[in-house]
C-alpha cells in the first residue's frame, strides 16, 4: 500500500497537534470551551488539482463529526477527534467546506475557503491588418481565456521589448476568470516590420505561490505610405513600327518603396520594367518596341500597388509605319556629257521632294534629268519624304552620289607651278590632279635626274631644289605641267667667311666683313657689344678703342645666325707713371715687389737692371702682372739705387729709369727694450730704457694702463708694474711689454712682544719682527748675553722663549738687511717674580755658568754664525740661539721686579762698524 500523500501527512500532523493541545487544555483548565478546526483554512489550488483537508476538535469524546463540501472526494481517514479527507478535481473558482463535530449536545463548526487558480497557458494577440497606413490608428487586442483569478492578473502589450500599455485587474471579484486588454496605436514608419506581442503575468506570490508568466506569439506589423498623386509617365507620343524607345514611370512619396509593385505595359504588351529606388521614390524604366500588328492608337499604362492600394496613369501612344524614300539614278557612273535621270519615290501617304522640288500629290514620285559635266562628279542628290501623323509632320530623307568620268586636270591650286619649302622639317610633297578615275601623278627632273616622292612624308634637303615635269594620267587621258622647287634655309656663319678672331695693328686701315650662307641670301650686320646702333661699316683707321667683341648677325626669312668676333688691336710698348713709377720705396718685410706694368699688345716683357754704384748689373725683382702660384721669391734685402727698365714686344721697345730707396718698419727686441727693468726708490726717474730700429727712425711711447710715462719724477714704489711700449713710423708699429720692479732699503716696520704684560720667571714670551724691503731683507737678532733656549722661526721673523729666566731679561735687537742697506730696532724684556731671592742665592752658580756660556757663545759666533746657519737642536742644547756682536752683546741681568717686555729707544740704526751675524735655522 502506498504511503500517505503530503497533504495527508500535513493533515495528520495538524490533528496530532490539536489533540496534544486538547489534552493539555483538559489537564490545565477543565472549564475551557470546545472548538472545531479545519486545516488549511484558506488554500489556493490549481484548477483540476487535489487537496487534503483535516478536520479536528478538542472535544474529549465527540459524538459524531464530518466534512461538508460539494467537491469530489477520493479518500477519508478518521481518528477519535479528527477526520482527514482528500478532495480531487477541484474546478470551482471558490468553495467553502465546513468541518463539524457534535460535543455535549452542541455542534462545533469550522469553515474553510478553497480557491482555484489557472495559469495563463493561452495568451492570444488578435491578428493585425496585412498593411496598415502610416498615420492611422490600429487596434491591439490581447485575450487570456480562463486564467485567474483575474485580480492577480496583469497584461502588457509590447512593441518589440518596449512596453506600450500595462494593466492589472486588481479589485476584480475572486471568482472572475480570464481577461482582455485592448489598445489603439498610431501607425508610424518605424513600426514597419516591428513585432507586437502580449505578456500575461499571474502573480500568486502573496498567497505563497509563484509568479506565472506567458507571452503570445509575436505578430509583425507592416506599415505603408502611398502618395495620392498619380505616377508620372515619360514616353514618346509617336512610335514608329520596328523602332525602340525608352519609357519611364516615376512616383514619389512611397514607403516602403521596396514593397511597391509596378506594372508598365504598352497596350497588352507587358514591358517588364527595371525599377530603381531612390529613397521614398522609384523610377521604372523599360524599352518599348512597336510592331506592325500594334499600328494605331495604343495606351501606355503605369500602375503602382502598395499595401492593397494602387495609383495608375495612362497615356496615348500612336504607332505608325513610315519607310524611308527610295532614290535611284539611271546610271550611278557616267562619262562626261551623258544624260542622267534621278527618281525619288515613297509610300502612298508620303509627299516626296527632290532637290527642293516637291511632287504634285502625295504618293507620286519626283524626277530630275541632267547632262553630266565635270562639276557633277561626286554630286549628291537629296530626296525628302514627309508624313502627317496625329497632327505632327514627320520627315525622312535619302541621298545618292553621281560619279562622272573625265580626263586629268593639273590646277595651280592642287599642283602649284612654284614650290618653296623650308629645309629640315619633314614635308609631304603634294601635286594632285583632278580626274575620274583618280589620276596617277609623277614628277621628275627634266634632265632625267631626281624624282619627287609625292604623297610621302620625308625630309626636305637642299639637293631637292630644281625644275620638275609633272604628268597626270588616267584612262580618260593625261595632263603635263612644269614646276620649280626652291628649298630655303637659315643663314650660316662659318670660320672661313666670318673668322672668330681678327687682329689689327694700331694706325693701319682695316674693315670688319662677314659673309654668310643661306637662301634667300642673308643680310649681315656687325655691332659692337654693349653699343646699340653702332654698326661697323667700311674702312677704319685702326685705334685702340676699336678692340673688343663684335656681334655679327646674319638674317633671312628662314631665320638668323649670330656670331661673336673678337677684334684685337696690337701696339708697341709704353710706360705710364702710375703703373711704373720713376721713384719707388721698398719697405723691408712688406712682402711687396716693384710693380712695373707696361701698356702694349702683345704684352711686353719687362726687365729692370741696376745702373752704376752698388746696383751695377743687379736684377730688380718685379711683381708678376697676374698673381700666380709660382710668384718670384721675395728678397730679404734690396739694394737701393738707380735701375733701368726695358719693355719689349714684337712691335718695338722702350726704356725708363727708376730710383729705388729702402726703408723698414719699427722693430724692438730684448737688446733695445729689455722686458724686465729695475729702479731704486728715491732715485731720479728717467724714461724707460726702450729704443727701436727702423727707417725712418721710429718714435717710442710707453704707458701704463693708458697713462703716459711722465718726463721727470722721483721713483716710488707705486711706479712698479707693467708698461706697454709702442714704436711707430710710417711703415707700421711694434710693441713690447716691460715689467718694472722698484727696489728699496729695508725698514723694520714692527717689533712687538707677546704677551704685552710682564713676563714672570718660568713663563713664555714671543718677539715678532716684520720688515719691509725689496729685495726681501734678511732678519737677524741680537739677544742679551747668557740668554739660553731661544727659538727662531724659519725666516727668523719670530723669536720665542719657553721657561723664561732672569738671563732672558735685557735688550733684544732685530736687524733687516738687503743689498741697499740695513735697519734695526730694539726692545727690552724684563723678567721678575717673588722668587727673586732664589736667583740671588744662585748668583755664584750663575756666574760659573755664565763663564761657560760665554765660551760657548764665542765658539758659536766664530763658527756657525759666520757661516750664516746652524742646527736648531744644537743651538738650543748649547743655550745660545742668537748671534752676538763682536763686543759680546749687552748686559741682560738688570730686570725690574714689576717690569715686562717693552721697546727701549724705538728704532735705532746700528752703527756701521758693529758686526751682527744672521742666523738661519735648519732642521736637524
UniProtKB/Swiss-Prot annotation:
Residues 857-924 are cytoplasmic. One of its GO terms (biological process) is regulation of synapse assembly. Residues 32-835 are extracellular. Disulfide bonds join 55-99, 59-103, 142-198, 249-302, 344-383, 415-470, 498-552, 580-645, 673-725, 769-814. Residues 48-130, 135-235, 242-329, 337-402, 408-486, 491-568, 573-662, 666-739, 746-830 form the Ig-like C2-type domain. Belongs to the immunoglobulin superfamily. ICAM family. This is Intercellular adhesion molecule 5. The lineage of its organism: Eukaryota, Metazoa, Chordata, Craniata, Vertebrata.
